[in-house]
Regions:
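Vicinal oxygen chelate
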Residues: 1-11, 14-23, 51, 69-131, ...
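A cross-family glycoside hydrolase active-site/sugar-binding cleft signature
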Residues: 19, 61, 79, 102, ...
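Conserved short beta-strand elements that form part of the metal-binding/catalytic scaffold
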Residues: 39-73, 123-128
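Short secondary-structure junctions
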Residues: 37-43, 98-103
C-alpha cells in the first residue's frame, strides 16, 4: 500500500533569506547597507537582513554567533537579476567593488552579466536577461 504524500501548507513562504557568514560583521553591514545601498529590513543584532528584492534577502551574520563559521572557500554566489546590467556595472565600477569582472554574455544561459567579490569573499553576480 502506497502512503499519501503530505500536503504542503497553504501558508507560502514570505521571504527567501540567504545567510552569509562574516568574520567582521561591520564590513558586511557597510557593504550591503552603505556601499550597495540595500535597506536593512530586520536587525537581529548579530545578524542584519537586507532586502534585495520584493521577497529576496541577504542575511549578514557574525560568524561567532551564527549556525556556521566563515570559511575560506565560498561555495555560495549571490545573484541579482536586474533590468539594466550596464547601469549597475557603471555604479559598481564607480564605487570600486573588489575583483570587478568585465561584462560578459552567455547565449546558452541567455544572460548578460558581471561579477565581483564582497568584503568576505562571496561572489556577487549581477545579471540581465537577454531574451
Amino acid at each position: 500500500m502506497q502512503m499519501e504524500r503530505p500536503k504542503l501548507p497553504d501558508n507560502k513562504a514570505e521571504k527567501l533569506i540567504t545567510f552569509i557568514y562574516y568574520k567582521d560583521l561591520q564590513k558586511g553591514i557597510d557593504f550591503y547597507g552603505k556601499t550597495l545601498g540595500f535597506p536593512m529590513e530586520i536587525d537581529q543584532g548579530w545578524c542584519k537582513i537586507y532586502r534585495i528584492s520584493e521577497a529576496g534577502y541577504v542575511g549578514v551574520v557574525d560568524e561567532t554567533r551564527g549556525m556556521h563559521k566563515s570559511h575560506p572557500v565560498k561555495p555560495v554566489q549571490i545573484c541579482l537579476r536586474v533590468p539594466d546590467v550596464d547601469a549597475f556595472y557603471k555604479y559598481c565600477r564607480e564605487i570600486g567593488v573588489d575583483e570587478l569582472s568585465e561584462i560578459f554574455e552567455s547565449q546558452e544561459l541567455k544572460i548578460k552579466a558581471f561579477v565581483f567579490n564582497d568584503p568576505e569573499g562571496y561572489q556577487v553576480e549581477i545579471q540581465q536577461s537577454i531574451q
